[in-house]
Amino acid sequence: MSLTLRPTQQLEKCSNADLTYWRATGNDPSFEVQLPSGSTAGGWYVLDLAVHVLRGRIHGPVLYPAYSHGHAAEAESLPIPLSDARSGLHTVRRLVRFVADVTSLRFDPSVLPCEFTAELSLRRLGKIEAARYMLSELLAARSGAGRVRLIARTALDLASGGPRRMADRLHGEYAAYAVATDVSDYDVWTDFYDDCSPDGVAVAMQALPELRSRPKFSIVMPTYNTPVKWLRACIDSVVSQTYENWELCIADDASPDATVWETIQSYVRRDSRIRAVRRDRNGHIAAASNSAIELATGQYIALLDHDDALHPLALQHCALALERNPRWRMLFTDEDKIDEAGKRSDPYFKSDWNPDLFLSQNCVCHLGVYEADLIREIGGFREGFDGAQDWDLALRATERLEPDQIGHVPKVLYHWRMIEGSTALAPGEKTYAHFAAMRAIEAHFVRTGTPAKVEEMPGYSGYYHIAYQTPVPAPKVTLLIPTRDRVDLLRQCIDSILERTTYPNYEIVVLDNGSTESATLGYFERITSHPSIRVLPYNAPFNYSAINNYGARETQGEVIGLLNNDIEVINPGWLSEMVSHALRPEIGVVGAMLYYPNDTIQHAGVILGIGGVAGHAYVGMPRGYPGDKHRAGLTQNLSAVTAACAVVRREVFEAVGGLDEGLVVAFNDVDFCIRVREAGYRNLWTPFAELYHHESASRGYENTPDKIARFKREEAFVKNRWGVLLSQDPYYNPNFSLSNAPFTLAYPPRNLGS
């Protein structure tokens, strides 16, 4: 069916003698797609898009379905694989799956200004046809053993679960493939928002007069047998800095290749800001770095590897950030990779200071800048940690700092060179670094008296699971489960807890909100004979916040677990993992990894600002999907998590007054988590607690006028309470979009003017 497009924002209808076309006047133009009969049934469809670009570029088109049940928490975006389309006709096809009946459809044609015509159509497919389409696309993207594994797994899914299971599983992989191939192209993004041309740099330099203080940066660079080509490129990137109060401190680690020292000396003769020392014997990177630090006279020390490069504005942005944030004693920036041809790729847009993520991966790394006095306080680099010497340094530095003394500049200011032997090219290149990092983290736990151990993650070099010990005896956990009938779901939930939970001390408290079915009431009678289960009646209109607050008041467990009745436990260690974090005094609310029954992600943490208030990360991606820089597989601090499965110490719950009973259904968990965060605790999400979430199956969907009106009131309430804070999630980089899928590039970035 061909679809009619009606402009809603940032679009002008234009015409000339030959045709009628559209002009996108901003970076967020959108159409309302007019659906036959006002809605479209859920299911599988092939989408065809034909655009004729007349002027400018079409980049990153996206389709946004709105569902009849108010799928609010997971506002879905379906990227269309069209990147940097310039003058001429462009056609593209992708498969889409509407998870329920679609009541409205929004089409955003481009994130860039342009003039164009567009035709959009949908054709419905059956499950088998959809599976065939996805399998064909996925096989074309694989080769060899990868194709064999995909075919075998698909055949197994078909045999064990029929066409539906096969299509569901394929869709998870297809969604991940679509994201990998359709994400906004970094080249286009840097063209618009990171102009390193002479003209672009000249414009950026206009901010230099803002600087009142001009601290000196001592750039510490150890060298050893560096290919001269990359050594020159590295030093040139320092010499080209727009900010001029720097010194480059080079320590050559007794390179056998004489041209390395000759090259360094040629730069020393040319620029008095370059200082160098040649070590008599090779001592490896930590010792060489310390030799370079001995040359430093600046207030701040920045770390630079001998074959990498600084962005021309790196020191300028660091100086501006330090002036605006005088408490900072340490800062880190975003980074990307650069190949031998100078092409940039794979940006790492980082979270602000994220202590738990930092223990799972070195999310500080490049560019790291430290107050020189701090480096001297901790004794510089420690030998014996080569390959992870910068991680060990950062661990020891942060032990002496308050969180507000650790800053993040959300700009790509460091380019990590991808050459043979570099971990930028392949993280497994230096396996010794993997084990050095483990030792560094273990040493950190010894120094801080933290009862935790570092566990490797099989198949992932440089990423770790931190397992915290729980006290003996284990504190009592009260699991609160609100329910109304749907005994099938409740039985599945409780059975899975009893059969698959290794944590030794918990009680299950069912909060009955007016169940009437005889099967449910009979089940209640049977389960109350279990010593760890009781049923509390709650005879009032449904209010998720009020029900759980009531349950908390009527129980005494040191730890409170909030669980929906449609949750099903997967891994036996789920509660031990969550409680081990919740018992840490600095931690507030702890969330889990939740999957839909088809093994796609339903919840991998909540990002503030997505869709206006908040949204889930990585919705619809297959189980095992790594996410941006493996963040979907690592424990980390986040601003919020879903209360469908959350754990929190009773003292924290009570300190903030529990859930806000003015929020009956929507966003009560987001509001609760923000209040906990504002009270000084860090919320945390762990992928090592895995459960299924058969979402909203008991309460029903937000599909009536009254429910929709209530949802809008609650949305407005949260927006009014938290305001601009919702668009400034410290754990979500401002270079990522709030309007498209989480962790895709923002057009423009929200920090463009800073």
Model-assigned labels for residue ranges:
Residues 301, 560:
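Short aromatic/hydrophobic "clamp" motif used to bind/position activated sugar donors
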Residues 279-296, 317, 538-555:
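Glycine-rich, basic loop-to-helix element that forms the pyrophosphate-binding segment
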Residues 239-278, 498-537:
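Acidic donor-binding segment of Leloir-type glycosyltransferases
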Residues 313-345, 419, 567-613:
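Conserved donor NDP-sugar-binding/catalytic core segment of glycosyltransferases
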Residues 374, 384-412, 441, 574-578, ...:
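A short, conserved alpha-helix in the catalytic core of glycosyltransferases
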Residues 164, 168-239, 442-446, 450-499:
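N-proximal low-complexity "stem/linker" segments adjacent to membrane-targeting elements
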